[in-house]
Amino acid sequence: MSVKISGKDYAGMYGPTKGDRVRLADTDLIIEIEEDYTVYGDECKFGGGKSIRDGMGQSPSAARDDKVLDLVITNAIIFDTWGIVKGDIGIKDGKIAGIGKAGNPKVMSGVSEDLIIGASTEVITGEGLIVTPGGIDTHIHFICPQQIETALFSGITTMIGGGTGPADGTNATTCTPGAFNIRKMLEAAEDFPVNLGFLGKGNASFETPLIEQIEAGAIGLKLHEDWGTTPKAIDTCLKVADLFDVQVAIHTDTLNEAGFVENTIAAIAGRTIHTYHTEGAGGGHAPDIIKIASRMNVLPSSTNPTMPFTVNTLDEHLDMLMVCHHLDSKVKEDVAFADSRIRPETIAAEDILHDMGVFSMMSSDSQAMGRVGEVIIRTWQTAHKMKLQRGALPGEKSGCDNIRAKRYLAKYTINPAITHGISQYVGSLEKGKIADLVLWKPAMFGVKPEMIIKGGFIIAGRMGDANASIPTPQPVIYKNMFGAFGKAKYGTCVTFVSKASLENGVVEKMGLQRKVLPVQGCRNISKKYMVHNNATPEIEVDPETYEVKVDGEIITCEPLKVLPMAQRYFLF
């Protein structure tokens, strides 16, 4: 016997289904569910009088070794770069076991082979919630450890960068220089509830000082103009990276002291490189570093202070620059240096280049001209701004924004994972990958997560008064959960290191308790590997007016006065 119910009632009980549309926060962005993996009438739902009970949705006999899940998230909106679907997410041994229909195959139709619910299974009710991969921020200045919780509570689960604390070198550059400092940061990483990887200092004209940092555990090298990003340093750094299969990130020469953007391109010589803040306000050849994004070997990212372009963007940048790069407002040359980096024309073009899929990644530049807790917010604010100013993207289905949404999600999930050689572990919701997931209420999407899961276990979330009779009374604030404590965090979180440091036993000698995994596949990639963000048009910059042209056409946009995902979400 079947029962018919309205779409509204169905969505209220089991969440939206195929063809239903959901607004992301208070933006103008709408996503549509493309497929529903659940089976109508056999949905899994937990609670009093619901279906996940012994002999019903829960197998009465299946033991944990019989492919029974450790955790299932039911009826969720699964939002990833490969699709926007409705279904159940199964997690086992800290990894994603599958996405599809979960339940008890003895009495339910269509249950996926690897998604059996049994007595060993915990349940999170995902009805009406959006689930995304944990975010990845690849431009971290590790200035203070408090950044890590701030990032985690915003939905970031992996942080890559460099630093040693509030040293002037760290304030300005994203480097953990030398074996001693790398070891100390790897040891410190043991205590933090996110995945971590550290970049060594890449500025050296000879190979030995760079090799010893990779062998000490650095997952890559960072070239920064404050250390002297000369053509020789660039070439040497990339030679070492090719030798050890690690990534190079670069902040180029704003002052054009050792050469211009063409000289840097020549020094890179077609080798793969991650260009930080490729627009240039964060640093790089003035005024035309943005041109480098047209190269197939260049993996370009933005940092969030210029994203999106608003009426306040220019005013706040000068003071940020003076502090971060140890400049003196009384020295006219220092002021001129700062002024040369702040160009409204290239900042306006940056928004459009993201929307075109030319810029591939978003990151923070934490406490060094960027906000570590706003990578995800700024990404979706930019997507909203571009929809307002540019309309629907080519190929978009009328009334929804799936193409644009997937493009922007990729900028802080799968693309940074591919760039830094960790996409086999994290960056997407796919079978076999580490279960780093973020759950959102649609109204809070991109701003305030409901819950963060790391390595298949709840590690952080919104929580009310601990003395209350139920979990929801105010004050509701973000708190670390059990996955962030004791020995649990050694299994829920990963430290990424170079393959060389594992093979030479350096990491083993440190006695690290966290799971340690090698980066790989950093040197054989190019822009074409950047999911939904692999465009390589010709980019030109007028040296006098700073106007940006893409394939011969000027691109620009107006700054916004009002953004979504802003004050109304942060009244308390």
UniProtKB/Swiss-Prot annotation:
Keywords: Cytoplasm, Hydrolase, Metal-binding, Nickel. The keyword Cytoplasm applies. It catalyses: urea + 2 H2O + H(+) = hydrogencarbonate + 2 NH4(+). Pfam families: Amidohydro_1 (PF01979), Urease_alpha (PF00449). The active site is at 325 (proton donor). Carboxylation allows a single lysine to coordinate two nickel ions. One of its GO terms (biological process) is urea catabolic process. It is found in: Cytoplasm. It comes from Acetivibrio thermocellus (strain ATCC 27405 / DSM 1237 / JCM 9322 / NBRC 103400 / NCIMB 10682 / NRRL B-4536 / VPI 7372) (Clostridium thermocellum). Its cofactor is Ni cation. One of its GO terms (molecular function) is nickel cation binding. Its EC number is 3.5.1.5. Substrate binds at residue 224. This is Urease subunit alpha.
